[in-house]
A protein has these predicted regions:
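Acidic/histidine-rich catalytic neighborhood of metal-dependent amide-processing enzymes
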Residues: 94-194, 198, 211, 215, ...
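Active-site-adjacent substrate-binding region
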Residues: 172-271
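Structural recognition of the beta-strand scaffold that forms the well-ordered cores
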Residues: 59, 74, 85-88, 127-130, ...
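N-terminal capping segment at the start of a domain
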Residues: 10-40, 53, 92, 165, ...
Length: 271
């Protein structure tokens, strides 16, 4: 369980009902560098989506050296069981990119999942998280700062025993089929195997590909702390507009967002 640390202020306008609408809206606001007003604005919107979905919402604040303060916005869904699954998406973008696919797409899927949790009926406790300060090219730090704080919190909440997996949704709004990535030598049956099985049940096309080095998304920090993590994102087509001005809302596609959401929902149902 995670205590609610701070209630998120409500965004003024209604939250769109689908991942594509949320991702389009967030990326239409322009770049969202770590610790900026843009990042905070996106996270307020996601916090509202979490609350509208009936989740307990908390904020985990942390310092971004030389930039200010960022945060992780955490929506908690409790079950009678002690096991835990985490689904996260980073909120920031690397200027000058408006960050539609990287990573308003992931935020959109996380927000849509929040509204579907009662229908999904997850088997384990779930933390849905909009992480902050992921873009190392902007923070200048070797770690994804929000993910590091989140992984430490998971570890403090008995993550070594409770956590089944922490999945980063990163660039899930354009290229498809997806790659499922992790820094391990071979797929683990309870992590990559379980996620791939869930994908197969709902027709989401996924191929596991080993990470280069320790990984380049928020799952990295979980693995470095000895907790199981993986990333769902772009496949062989890559992301040609990553960190560029051309990563605009018009590039987002509905199909990959729907397929990502279906896969994760099925994975959350698994025993």
């Amino acid at each position: 369980m995670i205590a609610t640390l701070l209630a998120i202020a409500a965004a003024g306008a209604p939250v769109p009902a689908d991942a594509h609408g949320i991702a389009t809206r967030i990326s239409s606001w322009g770049p969202r560098p770590a610790a900026s007003r843009g990042e905070a604005r996106a996270q307020r919107l996601i916090g509202r989506a979490f609350r509208d979905g009936g989740l307990r919402v908390g904020v985990q604040e942390f310092r971004v050296p030389g930039k200010g303060r960022s945060r992780n916005v955490i929506g908690v869904y409790d079950t009678p069981r002690s096991c835990l699954r985490i689904v996260m998406a980073h909120s920031d973008s690397l200027p000058p990119a408006p960050g539609a696919n990287d990573n308003a797409s992931g935020l959109g899927v996380v927000a849509e999942l929040a509204g579907r949790m009662k229908r999904i009926r997850p088997w384990c406790d779930v933390w849905l998280v909009a992480t902050g300060a992921e873009e190392r090219g902007y923070t200048g730090k070797p770690d994804h700062l929000g993910a590091l704080q989140l992984a430490r919190r998971a570890r403090a909440h008995h993550g070594r025993k409770r956590l089944r997996w922490a999945l980063s949704l990163d660039e899930v709004g354009r290229d498809y089929p997806f790659w499922l990535r992790s820094p391990v030598g071979a797929p683990r049956s309870a992590v990559e195997g379980a996620l791939s099985d869930a994908a197969g049940r709902v027709g989401t096309e996924v191929t596991w590909v080993r990470d280069e080095d320790t990984g380049n998304s928020d799952h990295r920090e979980f693995e470095l702390l000895g907790l199981p993590g993986a990333k769902l994102g772009v496949g062989a087509g890559g992301e040609p507009c990553r960190h560029m001005r051309c990563d605009t809302p018009s590039r987002l596609k509905r199909k990959p967002l729907v397929m990502a959401r279906r896969m994760v929902a099925e994975a959350l149902r698994l025993r």
